[in-house]
Amino acid sequence: MGLVIYDTLARRKVPFEPAVPGHVGIYVCGPTVYADPHLGHARGPVVYDVLRRYLLHKGYKVRFVSNITDVGHLTDDADEGEDKIVRRAKLERLEPMEVAEKYTWSYFDAMQALNVLRPSIAPRASGHIPEMLELTERLLARGVAYERKGSVYFRVRSFPEYGKLSGKRLEELRAGARVEVREEKEDPLDFALWKAAEPGHIMRWKSPWGEGYPGWHIECTAMSLKYLGEGFDLHAGGIDLQFPHHECEIAQAEAAGFRFARHWMHHNHVLLEGEKMAKSTGNLVLLHDLLEAHEPMALRFYLLQTHYRSPMDFTWEGLESAKRGYGRLLHAYREVRGRKKTAPPGTTPELERALDALEKAFMEAIEDDLSTPEALAALFAFLPELHKLLPEAKAESLARAEAVFHTLGEGILGLFPERVLEERVSGPLLEGLIALLLELREEARRAKDYEKSDLIRERLRALGVIVEDTKEGPRWRLER
């Protein structure tokens, strides 16, 4: 079938066909690095990581660009307020670039824990001021921007297609615009390409219009065009960036005479108690807290259980359920690896057919607008047949099953790095806890409470602890 994505600009699912055969250029809006990331910041990177992994699996060469916003993102996301990083620098009594560096690495560390591939290029806005100035001067020369008091604004009315991404109309936007706009603006909808620095503003650069700093929207336009060129394949980001950020990006690029992104994808919010997770409101769960307390791959699994275009409601119960579900898949993968070593040679036709069905269902799901919930469902649907066939399975079929688990589960979904397949917990605490559970199981057996006894055994098995009943009593071993 080939990959089909929901294109926000087209407002429908469309075939994803790269402009240059065999090559894909993707730009994803990255974080504004003024605080530690929360769970909402992980959703986009995980989703687009799956897309990237799928394309790599299909043999494409992928240039994946995701920026770091370390200047110009103001506190009200428009043209007023204080730079978010400058504000944090004052609170922490640090230089702005110290703040940016600190939280950039906080973000990268979290992404590494979640098994997200590093971007091909991770450009920082502060390192691309010349490109932004050049683009601003080009817009001025074309008459679609104007300078007032050292600031430069984009003239929205000069771009009739403004609103084509979000579906918003200029008349409606003007009707809802704030009255108390800056005096130097010709129109309330005009947005800043370059801002004159107020006295005492820390982050400032020289420009033809005086010292200042870039507007937020022009940063991504300049960097995406620099590293991916005109008409690159895909621009992606959170649904909250669709307007005004991405709308303004399109206006800037096309008004400057450049062909911009061919496709647009947007992922939905992560919600906590029905409200969007956000640093600005404090309604959040910090990513590092979750990663320290829970298996990172179970957290990644949790994020992939909901389709990227649907809101995701975070609950602790949902996370615990995801941990159990992930444990089932990991257990199955480990069991296949372990049994392969001692299985007799040959193939098992029933297992081969089950693997064929799994691969078909999985790829159909991924190629249908990255339906990761359906892809996971295909893996779970395969498990009963796998467990039924494992005791008699032959080595060649088990080797194929291992390869399929690796390709689908790790290669595309990114859920099974070697660390989780090999990592073992040991020590007195582990041994003591297992001994306690086995003692409770023996008490249940003596009381003929076989349901409870079986439940303890199965729960231990799901955690990778194999219990064997012998004449001398129960023995346990960690699954290999």
UniProtKB/Swiss-Prot annotation:
This is Cysteine--tRNA ligase. It is found in: Cytoplasm. A motif ('KMSKS' region) lies at residues 276-280. PANTHER family: CYSTEINE--TRNA LIGASE, CYTOPLASMIC (PTHR10890:SF3), CYSTEINYL-TRNA SYNTHETASE (PTHR10890). Its cofactor is Zn(2+). A motif ('HIGH' region) lies at residues 31-41. Binds 1 zinc ion per subunit. It is an enzyme of class 6 (ligase). It catalyses: tRNA(Cys) + L-cysteine + ATP = L-cysteinyl-tRNA(Cys) + AMP + diphosphate. Zn(2+) binds at C29, C220, H245, E249. The gene is cysS. SUPFAM superfamilies: Anticodon-binding domain of a subclass of class I aminoacyl-tRNA synthetases (SSF47323), Nucleotidylyl transferase (SSF52374). Monomer. GO terms for molecular function: ATP binding; cysteine-tRNA ligase activity; zinc ion binding. GO terms for cellular component: cytosol. InterPro entries: Cys-tRNA-ligase (IPR015803), Cys-tRNA-synt_Ia_DALR (IPR015273), Cys-tRNA/MSH_ligase (IPR024909), CysS_C (IPR056411), Rossmann-like_a/b/a_fold (IPR014729), tRNA-synt_1_cat_dom (IPR032678), tRNAsynth_Ia_anticodon-bd (IPR009080). ATP binds at K279. One of its GO terms (biological process) is cysteinyl-tRNA aminoacylation. Belongs to the class-I aminoacyl-tRNA synthetase family. Its EC number is 6.1.1.16. Keywords: Aminoacyl-tRNA synthetase, ATP-binding, Cytoplasm, Ligase, Metal-binding, Nucleotide-binding, Protein biosynthesis, Zinc. Disulfide bonds: none annotated.
